[in-house]
Amino acid sequence: MNQLDALRQMTVVVADTGDIDAIKAYQPEDATTNPSLVLSASALPQYAPLIDEAIAYAKAKSNDKAQQLIDAEDKLAVNIGLEILKVVKGRISTEVDARYSYDTEKTIAKARKLIALYNEAGISNDRILIKIASTWQGIKAAEQLEKEGINCNLTLLFSQAQARACAEAGVYLISPFVGRILDWYKANSDKKEYAPAEDPGVVSVTSIYNYYKQHGYNTVVMGASFRNAGEITELAGCDRLTIAPALLKELQESEAPLVRKLEYKGEVKARPAPMTEAEFYWEHNQDPMAVEKLAEGIRKFAIDQEKLEAMLLAKF
């Protein structure tokens, strides 16, 4: 049995891509997108009609150019999601504009709009996850959205404080990053090579997984952002793992044995009192890696959102 099939027996495999052909090839349960993946998918020729349709939709909705652009980018993200939902049995994750990462109300409004666009296309809420950056404001937005029956995927998660706040807010799923944590440690320390078991990203996700299971939180842990297959195999047993096509291919081509690494069998402990905003910032800011990577991730997604807007504007 190849490693991908072995992994499927213990972990829900998710494709981290907007490329329909790649998704068809590996038959994941779910798929995740982000502004960077939407931007790269938009360059694929088969997506040209989706862009044209999004622009036509936006022009019909408003005469204001700025509003048309907002409507077109939202509709395009949903159009790509709709195509992906034709080939996955489970859920699509669609991300809120990263520029709203520190604005709870705008995040809630954008999430409701994206859900409405999916609903108009006949897709029920149980097939969608709204992706939101794991800022305090994003977590508070998700807490409200969950109460409305809108499930959320909290992304750009690098610290234990972020993970704890997400669980306490009752969010459906978190995406703790692995590879970007490794990147930071390689760039900021003398150690340049890590065995998979001691990879700081693997250690972080393992710690979060165990904390959730120890305290009986139902929030799904979906490891994300992988730099090599060793990080993935070291997290076998995690609730879900979202994996880029190149690494799905590598796993599929490997016949090496796969051992379950994550499985909590201990007793469930009492949960601590929920964190306050002050406690969240204090604990999160104790981790310079998490502070830098959260800010950088938001900036990068915002830059790609702006590139997407420029691409759309050129087609108006």
From Swiss-Prot:
- Give the matching CDD domains: Transaldolase_TalAB (cd00957)
Which Pfam families does its entry note?
TAL_FSA
- What processes does the entry annotate via GO biological process terms? carbohydrate metabolic process; pentose-phosphate shunt
Task: List the EC numbers from the record.
Answer: 2.2.1.2
User: What pathway or pathways are given for this protein in its record?
Assistant: Carbohydrate degradation; pentose phosphate pathway; D-glyceraldehyde 3-phosphate and beta-D-fructose 6-phosphate from D-ribose 5-phosphate and D-xylulose 5-phosphate (non-oxidative stage): step 2/3
Which keywords has UniProt assigned to this entry? Cytoplasm, Pentose shunt, Schiff base, Transferase
Question: Where along the chain is the active site annotated?
Answer: 131 (schiff-base intermediate with substrate)
Where it sits in the cell: the answer is: Cytoplasm
Q: Which GO terms describe its molecular function?
A: transaldolase activity
* Entry keyword Disulfide bond: no
The residues forming a coiled coil are none
Q: What is the reaction catalyzed?
A: D-sedoheptulose 7-phosphate + D-glyceraldehyde 3-phosphate = D-erythrose 4-phosphate + beta-D-fructose 6-phosphate
Q: Which GO terms describe its cellular component?
A: cytosol
InterPro entries per UniProt:
Aldolase_TIM, TAL/FSA, Transaldolase_1, Transaldolase_AS
HAMAP family per record: Transaldolase_1
Subunit organization: Homodimer.
Query: What exactly does this protein do?
Result: Transaldolase is important for the balance of metabolites in the pentose-phosphate pathway.
| Similarity annotation | Belongs to the transaldolase family. Type 1 subfamily.
What is the recorded name of this protein? Transaldolase
